[in-house]
A protein has these predicted regions:
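Generic structural detector for well-ordered beta-strands
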Residues: 12-16, 65, 92
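Hydrophobic ligand-binding cavity/cleft-lining segments
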Residues: 1-47, 160
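Glycine-rich portal/gate segments that line the openings of hydrophobic small-molecule binding cavities
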Residues: 33-34, 41-88, 101-103, 144
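Beta-strand/loop substructures that line and gate deep hydrophobic ligand-binding cavities in soluble
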Residues: 81-143, 148-155
Length: 160
């Protein structure tokens, strides 16, 4: 096994789709259930803006909320017990022109912060999961791009 970072974990991928399409995918709570290994088969929970899914690891039901920031191309994921969701995961999309990429591509970075008290084994599993999840996101976004190339995506402004 590799050494696991103690405080945070970050993974980045090149996505062959526009930043807007990638952001739209990440901001859709129902799509989280297609790539987040701890929240598969996502569905709305019993409170507005809160969703639940099942962990592929142990079948436990997990809750999450999605807070998109369109102007920043940033999506914040709050996770934890339904009544105590905490923002611990972020997905940041970087536009092609910011880093000299081809126009129809972008970078995606997933970042997770380790809470104090999270056991090393669980943190290691989370880090390994993110290394897989970024591939799931990449493939699903790129497959959507192939099905609907040049789809114009207009982002809504950040909620006030």
């Amino acid at each position: 096994m590799t050494e696991i970072p103690a405080l945070a974990h970050t993974v980045t991928a090149l996505i062959d789709a526009s930043a807007e399409r990638t952001f739209e995918f990440l901001a859709d709570p129902m799509k989280v259930g297609n790539w987040a290994l701890a929240s598969m088969q996502a569905q709305p929970a019993d409170a507005p803006g809160i969703y639940r899914g099942r962990s592929l690891f142990d079948g436990v039901q997990n809750h999450f909320a999605v807070t998109p920031h369109p102007q920043l191309l940033l999506v914040e994921y709050s996770v934890g017990p339904r009544d105590a969701l905490t923002p611990r995961i972020r997905a940041q999309v970087i536009r092609a022109e910011s880093v000299g990429l081809a126009a129809a591509s972008c970078y995606l970075t997933l970042t997770a912060w380790r809470p104090i008290g999270m056991p090393a084994a669980r943190w290691g599993r989370l880090c390994a999961s993110h290394n897989v999840e970024i591939w799931l996101i990449k493939e699903q976004v790129e497959a959507a791009e192939l099905r609907e190339p040049a789809k114009e995506v207009r982002l809504k402004p950040d909620p006030q």
